[in-house]
């Protein structure tokens, strides 16, 4: 059953050895290798399939609810029979191309593909075993090693290979009714995932997140919205979180600490400076903090309380880390502090030995002004 049926826009067609279910922009073909169909039912099979009695005269119809069956004959005691079922998920192309693709898949040696796939992922785990964990000597170590390997295998499932966008958690329910709805990219969440990626020597994946996804999703004013689809499009949001913006700057410097790549810092410097400019304006708007004026603890607390109650702010008040309450929160302020600290460290790491800065008075003056404001 296809769950994404809307207004009877899902159809089914019987093909050689199976069936093809399709909508306007996708198709799911289910078919067997070396076995012909015994029976099928395109319409109303939800109840009949429970009795194992499916039959239909139609070869095509509008239905999200279809079924097929195969006859394996009599299976004797201790006897094994193999039924290889292929599931082909693809875009909905023209019919002849789809049928050609089904023919191609039926000719694939599945045992060979299984062995090749297993070998690939074993090499992948070995390449990213940066902690150098050895084979387990007891059940406790065995459990740790299992979680460790599964963690390595998980990260490729989280990341969009084209944009570098990283979802917070995998989802299996396309209707988002029986899950946490975490198959989106929160910049903050992704930043902490890239820290784990760095530990596991996934440098390319981390750099793609910053150099492609973050640049693609940064707003003109320098901020990042709450969450996105991994292709970079804005996802439904319910407010603003200032730590989304601050975390990206922090993450850029954290990645540099692993790689020591000045090129990576230079490639992302402009993006970080735009974010820092936004954070400074945000603080000025909500806390009325300018320059290096000293304030004692009570004065800061008083200013925060007064600021929250004032009307006419340019920027929307931020949600907390868990999106429960709007206001000025310790974690949010800490993330901004970390962003300011990170940009100062980025400037320090780049120094004056970067060709773009040499003899560039305007650039150097901007950097010095930025540093003074932050400090």
Which positions does each model-derived feature cover?
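Aromatic-rich carbohydrate-recognition surfaces in CAZymes
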Residues: 182-290, 297, 303-304, 333-337
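Acidic/polar, glycine-enriched structural segments that form the non-catalytic walls/loops
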Residues: 2-181, 262-263
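Extended hydrophobic/Leu-rich segments
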Residues: 2, 12-14, 20-26, 31-32, ...
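Solvent-exposed loop and edge beta-strand segments that line ligand/cofactor-binding
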Residues: 120-127, 134-140, 172-190, 197-198, ...
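Extended, well-ordered alpha-helical scaffold segments
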Residues: 98-120, 143-150, 201-216, 262-282, ...
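Catalytic cores of carbohydrate-active enzymes
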Residues: 182, 221-228, 288-375
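Well-ordered alpha-helical scaffold segments within catalytic/enzyme domains
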Residues: 87, 128-142, 153-157, 191-203, ...
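N-terminal start-of-domain structural block
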Residues: 161-162, 168-186, 212-218, 222-223, ...
């Amino acid at each position: 059953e296809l769950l994404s049926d809307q207004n009877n826009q899902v159809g089914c067609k019987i093909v050689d050895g199976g069936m093809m279910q399709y909508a306007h922009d996708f198709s799911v073909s289910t078919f067997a290798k070396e076995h012909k169909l015994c029976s099928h039912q395109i319409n109303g099979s939800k109840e009949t399939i429970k009795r194992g009695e499916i039959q239909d005269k139609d070869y095509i119809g509008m239905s999200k609810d279809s079924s097929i069956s195969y006859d394996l004959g009599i299976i004797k005691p201790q006897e094994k029979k193999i039924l290889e079922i292929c599931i082909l998920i693809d875009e909905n192309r023209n019919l002849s191309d789809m049928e050609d693709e089904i023919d191609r898949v039926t000719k694939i040696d599945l045992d060979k593909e299984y062995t090749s796939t297993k070998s690939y992922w074993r090499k992948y785990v070995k390449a990213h075993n940066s902690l150098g964990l050895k084979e387990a000597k007891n059940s406790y170590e065995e459990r740790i090693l299992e979680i460790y390997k599964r963690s390595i295998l998980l990260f490729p499932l989280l990341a969009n290979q084209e944009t570098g966008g990283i979802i917070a958690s995998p989802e299996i329910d396309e209707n988002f009714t029986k899950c946490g709805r975490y198959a989106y990219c929160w910049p903050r969440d992704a930043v902490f995932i890239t820290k784990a990626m760095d530990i596991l020597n996934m440098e390319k994946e981390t750099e793609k997140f910053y150099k492609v996804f973050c640049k693609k999703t940064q707003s003109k004013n320098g901020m990042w919205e709450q969450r996105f689809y991994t292709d970079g499009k804005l996802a439904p949001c319910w407010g603003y979180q200032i730590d989304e913006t601050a975390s990206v700057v922090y993450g850029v410097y954290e990645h540099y600490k692993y790689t020591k790549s000045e090129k990576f810092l230079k490639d992302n410097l402009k993006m970080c400076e735009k974010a820092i400019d936004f954070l400074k304006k945000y603080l000025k708007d909500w806390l009325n903090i300018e320059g290096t004026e000293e304030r004692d603890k009570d004065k800061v607390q008083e200013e925060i309380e007064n600021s929250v109650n004032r009307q006419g702010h340019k920027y929307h008040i931020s949600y907390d880390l868990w999106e429960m309450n709007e206001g000025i929160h310790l974690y949010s302020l800490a993330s901004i502090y970390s962003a300011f600290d990170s940009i100062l460290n980025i400037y320090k790491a780049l120094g004056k030995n970067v060709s773009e800065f040499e003899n560039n008075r305007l650039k150097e003056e901007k950097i010095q002004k930025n540093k003074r404001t932050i400090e």
